[in-house]
């Protein structure tokens, strides 16, 4: 154990789980501070890791000073404004001997970038189509290298799908019928085959996949996405160009919880130029 009195900065799932683990190991977790006005973790982890142990969560707060030379003696928290800047006069000193930083995950893609895979600036992972194929033909991505997941169940599903589609690609290569690249270097659709951009708007930060090729879609296509803020009593709407084909009510949408919808291949006509997912 690095210490006995702990302050945690960051309320994603790892930070929340570490708060519980350090408490169970005998430490006193004094507070979990979060820069954003919402937690980045699953609701159940907030309840099971913080609420059940009486650990306070301070939203819209960050560490502005660390006291100590040879080791930490305390930290100063401050509330932040809508621009994430500390608000003068809101400082609070908290004695502690350990500061645990849990400030976000990004996919590790050194191998991908070295190969020339195009990355999504929002997720930090590759841009993929419905088969989880990148802009490099025959190169597929799944799991946390693609985008950070909440649940290992989703990682397992993506891994199975990527393996299935990679095997199908190899069979097409041997048959002399391999498709062209998913996207060009700029992320644009290849002219060799029909590709439909899939985009998020009005609160949807990104979608996986980012492109759909009707010729290679299964009848049911899972699309995963995250929102950029907390929404209550909102709806997830799907548009083909400007025509709405789906609307699903959600009591709560939060950045810390990955969302998903299922599109049907039979609902997508050949003349569609784009698909959009919006929060309404």
PLM regions with names:
Residues 97-149:
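FAD-site-proximal beta/loop scaffold in flavoenzymes
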Residues 142-176, 180, 188-200:
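A conserved FAD-binding loop/helix module that cradles the flavin
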Residues 223, 236-238, 263-280:
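Short, aromatic- and glycine-rich surface loops/edge beta-strands on solvent-exposed regions
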């Amino acid at each position: 154990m690095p210490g006995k009195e702990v302050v945690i900065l960051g309320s994603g799932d790892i930070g929340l789980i570490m708060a519980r683990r350090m408490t169970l190991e005998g430490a006193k977790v004094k507070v979990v501070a979060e820069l954003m006005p919402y937690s980045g973790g699953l609701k159940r982890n907030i309840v099971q890791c913080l609420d059940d142990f009486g650990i306070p969560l301070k939203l819209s707060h960050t560490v502005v000073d660390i006291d100590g030379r040879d080791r930490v003696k305390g930290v100063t928290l401050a509330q932040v404004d809508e621009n994430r800047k500390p608000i003068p006069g809101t400082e609070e000193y908290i004695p502690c001997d350990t500061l645990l930083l849990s400030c976000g995950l990004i996919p590790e893609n050194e191998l991908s970038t070295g190969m020339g895979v195009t990355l999504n600036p929002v997720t930090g992972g590759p841009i993929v189509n419905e088969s989880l194929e990148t802009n490099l033909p025959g190169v597929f991505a799944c799991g946390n290298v693609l985008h950070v997941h909440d649940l290992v169940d989703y990682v397992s599903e993506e891994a199975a799908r990527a393996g299935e589609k990679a095997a199908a690609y190899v069979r097409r290569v041997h048959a002399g019928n391999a498709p062209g690249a998913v996207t060009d270097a700029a992320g644009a659709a290849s002219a060799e085959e029909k590709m439909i951009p899939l985009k998020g708007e009005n609160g949807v930060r990104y979608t996986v996949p980012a492109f759909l090729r009707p010729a290679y879609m299964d009848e049911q296509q899972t699309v995963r996405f995250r929102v950029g803020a907390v929404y209550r009593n909102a709806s997830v709407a799907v548009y083909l160009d400007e025509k709405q084909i789906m609307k699903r009510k959600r009591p709560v949408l939060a950045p810390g919880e990955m969302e998903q919808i299922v599109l049907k291949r039979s609902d997508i006509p050949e003349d569609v130029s784009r698909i959009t997912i919006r929060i309404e």
